[in-house]
């Protein structure tokens, strides 16, 4: 993972309305194994983070200047240090306007993964710990707590520059339960949500369920294809990459690599060619299936306890809210 440029600034700020104090670094960080390890750990923590949103920049304006500064840097109208200085000063201002915000170390990293350029911006905090020194004494020690990552964004620079239609070249961590504490950071980046990752993932899973049902697959085959989908989606989420429908289709049915893709297009589910995987939605998706003596039952695990009740002692399933099509067939029968 070649690191093109990386720098860290510090903002001192308490959540009590006091002014934020900026300690800006004048030069980029030099290349070292420690820097590479830190960025690798940061990426791993970010990829594992649930509840991310995907979107795009707002139009350039005085309220959202970040994209203009980034463009100036990429066009070589200013260097990376100057770009980061403009950005962190803007973040300092937004922090002062948000009483709930706290300071920390602000990291800017421009790096390359494969053929793709990324910019990661993250607000990092320290944790107190202990260490054993050379004289075998136990001493206090601070370390960057990359596991507690609450404010961060990653911009796919290559996607932004080369795909003008994209609405998902930025990912960012959303605040939990609608909290406003992270809004200032989203405004700092100047991004808006362009893709509903949970909704897109649910639609994909619905399309997959319809596909499996239409194929009338044996139970074992249906389970294998489900595991393939969940495995691929989970793998992409760990990499921080979206799912590609054509690639997924080829994995689901190697003999007919276009079958699932054509099913999606023919049914017009409205899915984008690339979908960011939502881990929470994926974790809820697992199918229970069974077939015997002319009876075939298949349903998603998250319906158990809501629309479907299982009585283990009686060996019965109670199903509520039957599909309209099934009810109509039963009436006619």
Curated annotation (Swiss-Prot):
The lineage of its organism: Bacteria, Pseudomonadati, Pseudomonadota, Gammaproteobacteria, Pseudomonadales. NCBIfam families: PRK00378.1. It is found in: Cytoplasm, Nucleoid. This is Nucleoid-associated protein. Keywords: Cytoplasm, Plasmid. It comes from Metapseudomonas resinovorans. PANTHER family: NUCLEOID-ASSOCIATED PROTEIN YEJK, PTHR38772. It holds the Pfam family NA37. HAMAP family: NdpA (MF_00730). InterPro entries: Nucleoid_associated_NdpA. The keyword Cytoplasm applies. Transmembrane segments: none annotated.
